[in-house]
Design a protein with these regions (language model features):
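Active-site-adjacent structural elements in enzyme catalytic cores
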Residues: 1-200
Length: 200
């Protein structure tokens, strides 16, 4: 199933349809401010397993939060790190932080860190707001494939439509992933330079 949602003015009925899929252990594909991404509810162990199987990679999953206070529910955020987050979010960044006790074991799998995002795109922002908890997320990206399929929702639907429960057509996406910043040490460390230019 593919659903058209305009990021400039997301339709509440369509967002509710997406939320209903997520609440029923569904996996979706949705637009961000970078590449398209797979997503499921953090509260659904069944959906997290399904997402991992679709992704078929060992790469770490991240979570999408609604705002900075939402991040502090799921990660330990010291004051200097909070200031960096505040300067750069919403935006095309994934910040790696120390996970709090509210992050399910199914997500962590013996890891102590959690990647967090707040994309600058109203579609995922509203999905998380109305779902009431973060999305577990992983980029629709394969280094061995032609990268175009990550930008065109119709092509994504052709490739993954039978594996996911819903694909959101939010227009063409970007073909560059987020900048990944580790904030678990003394200083923020960029481990992957992507679309965003970090402001310290």
């Amino acid at each position: 199933m593919i659903v058209k949602i305009y990021p400039q003015n997301p339709n509440r009925k369509a967002i509710d349809q997406v939320v209903a899929v997520l609440e029923n252990d569904g996996v979706i594909v949705y637009p961000t401010d970078t590449v398209y991404a797979f997503g499921c509810s953090l509260k659904s162990p069944k959906a997290i397993e399904k997402l991992k199987a679709i992704r078929d990679k060992d790469g770490e999953l991240s979570i999408v939060c609604a705002d900075l206070s939402h991040i502090s529910d799921y990660a330990k955020v010291e004051t200097p790190v909070f200031k960096v987050l505040k300067r750069n979010l919403p935006g095309p960044f994934t910040f790696i932080l120390k996970a709090s006790g509210r992050v399910p074991e199914k997500y962590l799998e013996k890891r102590k860190n959690v990647g967090v995002r707040i994309p600058e795109n109203p579609i995922p922002q509203q999905i998380v707001e109305y779902l009431g908890n973060p999305l577990v997320t992983a980029s629709v990206r394969d280094e061995d494939d032609v990268i175009e399929y990550t930008t065109d929702p119709e092509l994504i639907h052709e490739k993954y439509g039978a594996l996911v429960d819903l694909v959101i057509d939010g227009g063409y996406g970007n073909n560059e992933a987020s900048t990944v910043v580790y904030c678990t040490g003394d200083e923020p460390e960029i481990v992957r330079q992507g679309l965003g230019e970090l402001v310290l």
